């Protein structure tokens, strides 16, 4: 059995935490927007473990793809913060009307989640399956939590 690098284990754990937090956010969003406004900003604390994970990858001379996917994740967190807290852009309410804001957001969302599935998958198939299942749950809760667009 091959020993896994600390950065790979850390990345897998970060992916699990990210998915669980997003699933929780989507579930809260459906029922209690006030609570989401109060507690949703704690999601941004994932910046710190992501930065530590980047350091671990560099320290271990790890796979550069981890750094790329971590950078995409950090970019996603940045755009999420800018849209929701800095500029207060309500692009989620009508993403067809606000497509210029939605496209980069969704691109980074899917790219970072792709990384959280594919990188653990290449390390350990069980890890990959766990991450894929969490991502599917994330997508389902995301779709169900957002209002339907009225034409």
Predicted regions and their residues:
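Hydrophobic alpha-helical membrane segments
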Residues: 71-84, 94-117, 127-137
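N-terminal signal-anchor/start-transfer transmembrane helix
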Residues: 6-32, 135
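Hydrophobic alpha-helical transmembrane segments in multi-pass integral membrane proteins
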Residues: 51-61, 105-123
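Cytoplasmic-side transmembrane-helix entry/capping segments in multi-pass membrane proteins
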Residues: 35-46, 70, 93-102
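Membrane-helix boundary elements
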Residues: 37-67
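Membrane-water interface at the C-terminal end of transmembrane alpha helices
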Residues: 23-25, 83-87, 111-121, 133-150
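Membrane-embedded alpha-helical segments in integral membrane proteins
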Residues: 1-2, 22-27, 49-58
